Amino acid sequence: MEKTYNPTSIEQDLYKTWEEQGYFKPHGDTSKDAYSIMIPPPNVTGSLHMGHAFQDTIMDTLIRCQRMKGKNTLWQVGTDHAGIATQMVVERKIAAEEGKTKHDYGRDAFIDKIWEWKAESGGTITKQLRRLGASVDWDRERFTMDDGFYKAVQEVFVRLYKDDLIYRGKRLVNWDPKLHTAISDLEVENKETKGHMWHFRYPLADGVKTADGKDYIVVATTRPETMLGDTGVAVNPEDPRYKDLIGKEIILPIVGRRIPIVGDEHADMEKGTGCVKITPAHDFNDYEVGKRHQLPMINILTFDANIRDAAEVFNSNGEASNAYGTEIPAKYQGMERFAARKAIVAEFEELGLLQEIKDHDLTVPYGDRGGVVIEPMLTDQWYVRAGILAKPAVEAVENGDIQFVPKQYENMYFSWMRDIQDWCISRQLWWGHRIPAWYDEQGNVFVGRNEEEVRAENNIAADVALRQDDDVLDTWFSSALWTFGTLGWPEKTPELKVFHPTDVLVTGFDIIFFWVARMIMMTMHFCKDEDGKAQVPFKTVYVTGLIRDENGDKMSKSKGNVLDPIDMIDGIDLESLVAKRTGNMMQPQLAAKIEKNTRKTFENGIEAYGTDSLRFTLAAMASTGRDINWDMKRLEGYRNFCNKLWNASRYVLMNTEEQDCGFAAGAELEYSLADKWIESQFELAAKEFNGHIDNFRLDMAANTLYEFIWNQFCDWYLELTKPVLWKGTEAQQRATRRTLITVLEKTLRLAHPVIPYITETIWQSVKPLVDGVEGDTIMLQALPQYDVANFNQEALDDIEWVKAFITSIRNLRAEYDINPGKPLEVMLKAANEQDAARIEANKPVLVSLAKLESIRVLADGEATPACATALVGKSELMIPMAGLIDKDAELDRLAKEIAKTQGEIARIEGKLGNEGFVAKAPEAVITKEREKLAGYQEALVKLEQQKATIAAL
């Protein structure tokens, strides 16, 4: 092994070997249990971010554990075609490079252009996955536009349509006026902004008056432009001010339309004026009110969000209606929506109908891709009747067929699913799964897998023109089929039989509804087991938190706080990091601030930490369901952990290579107490690690590895072996060498799922030295399980006592500033015979590691000189202090330390006693100051105790 651990020199070559040797594939033995995970398909346009790295580390750890347990494991990888995102990338590319739009190309040629782009640039994220050590079966890589998956999508759509679970209807959707498509709620970014609330007077019709004698009511709105489409005003039926007006009408200003006053609890008596204008075609809440009261819907906006030349009028079911005229005042026709807002407010003012304007904090919806304000828009779209599909999906979680980890997310799932609305699945894009529906010239719709099937099933002659629907399916529709569509469904493939249902889905809470719930609905509707029972897509949903920056802020390009996992693996210099964070920004005005913060946070750029350090950090921070504040210091700490494992392994190899390790038949072996202890500690670690993995507590599993490797194996066991290897008998040395190499080999196997590269590299050097270990790779070795035969409680208890004894000596040396190399005379006032026996049995180790001149057990009642003392269990350890220290110099040193500590206490108490500081400082800063104060106060008590002890000498 190389003297120092250098991840750069081993990782990529090692991964290439793993992949070429086919170690990631299922072993295919169907007599063994199967285990499968489907990677949530990242967007093909994307690159690896910290969230991916986090979830992929979790999945790879789970998969490697199960593979090492002998299971037939499949971790299937793939990417999503990402409709809007991909289309925008290619549209921007042809605009920048060729000055063309998609319309210059035409649909088919533009789609060819996207396929070209995918071939050239679409594999970035899968290349990066390899850098993370992801042991996915690359031969089964899938894409949501693959021929096989396309066939599954078409099949699902056709069957749902024939089951009357898909229909085409006119409903309200999130409309992106820039991209000209409906978008999902997840693609809407709500931004807090300062705005206004306009209070308009709406005149009452037919001479009606309010309870206080006014001939108008006042409505409050943040969107004056939509009043052109008002079809009602809602008041609360319990509101004494207005309840007598229910059933009356108002004359809508500007357009002169008579519209009813309806009683509806949507109107809040305590909010605004208590009167709410209802615009069913341009507000989601109003749409529901309109349906309840069968109000007409008037669409006043074009797809560009300009005012139409003539309104569209529909009844509450979305059918064309003549309930109202379509006239829009000429001055507003074609006007941009926000210009219309100003003009309408001005006209209300001219008419004397603008009562007041109030400042108002608004939440405004923006499209996360197009970047413009989203409009609720009445459009013809395709919908899934989700309520019918949701019922069995709810029951699957209620009865435990699917479990959420942490369990609290079940409530989030239930709250969505029990109030589910029909799902809009069509998008006005070119890139995606085109909807398999055709129209004749009369507007009749025909659904089938292809045009030939449509003509055959419906007896449509070849000379009758058919036009395919221009829309494509929402990407969430196709990705809802991910667990079964990628395994060959609708064919009954062997893979589908073996690997479905999958075992675990690792995902974020933000897509429980958009993806997780829809996968459950679709899978249970289409996949049945041999007994005809609906299959679930996965047995467990492991919900992770978000990775945030060190301050707890969400990572985003606009904040300039994004960390690239690859930069932490390979390192990046400061100038490159600044350029990366400030380049291609949507808001270039933020660049200077981002540069300043980056230079402050990363003065020297980012070091290369290697993949294993990153993976271990991510695992160690994976507390289920909680958001994680990224901490570069922990990454540095776990890089040190990898170095510690490397150096410990070199020590083991230096003491075992070309040595007698006791594997020969009949070899005499005399195991030390420490040998038995480390075997027992390992068994406990294996038991804990497996339990934590089974419970999805990767943070605790990583902590178990850290505690065992760093604290037990490296810090204690290796030290405890030195007296044996230097001065022990041949039988003792043989046994210790055998223990060193076998425990290291088992430890490497236990740690491998979390830190695969370093463990494989070391294992290749260790393997030849351990009898009975065969195979070319550690990843196909057995994951260690608890073995009671190797567990010795007495050895555990005895070595814990030995550790406490040595630690107490070291602590006393530090407290009294005794030279760490000076041999000490130590006495023990033993509490029982067991402790006296422990001294006798372990004297060579105690003398060596605690650096003692002598050690003896005191007789009962024996007088002792002035000593420094410590408790070890129930016994008292004593170090005679005469001649060990310069009493006057030590008292002088302690006096200075005490004065310094008292000064710090006074300073912090003054700070915390300052009302201005406490009122203005963040809670975290105040907490930190209080913690510092407690630390200084504790230190002061110890210093004064030491001073008293030394003064008595």
From Swiss-Prot:
- One Pfam family named in its UniProt record: Val_tRNA-synt_C
- The UniProt entry's coiled-coil ranges are 884-952
Return the Gene3D superfamilies for the record.
HUPs, Isoleucyl-tRNA Synthetase, Domain 1, Valyl-tRNA synthetase, C-terminal domain, Valyl/Leucyl/Isoleucyl-tRNA synthetase, editing domain
Q: Where is this motif: 'KMSKS' region?
A: 554-558
Could you give the subunit structure recorded for this chain?
Monomer.
What name does this protein carry? Valine--tRNA ligase
Q: Which family does the record claim for this protein?
A: Belongs to the class-I aminoacyl-tRNA synthetase family. ValS type 1 subfamily.
**Annotated compartments:** Cytoplasm
Molecular function via GO: aminoacyl-tRNA deacylase activity; ATP binding; valine-tRNA ligase activity
> Domain of life, per the record?
Bacteria
Record text about domains: ValRS has two distinct active sites: one for aminoacylation and one for editing. The misactivated threonine is translocated from the active site to the editing site.
Q: Which reaction does it catalyse?
A: tRNA(Val) + L-valine + ATP = L-valyl-tRNA(Val) + AMP + diphosphate
Q: Where is this motif: 'HIGH' region?
A: 42-52
Entry keywords, A to Z? Aminoacyl-tRNA synthetase, ATP-binding, Coiled coil, Cytoplasm, Ligase, Nucleotide-binding, Protein biosynthesis
Q: What does this protein do?
A: Catalyzes the attachment of valine to tRNA(Val). As ValRS can inadvertently accommodate and process structurally similar amino acids such as threonine, to avoid such errors, it has a 'posttransfer' editing activity that hydrolyzes mischarged Thr-tRNA(Val) in a tRNA-dependent manner.
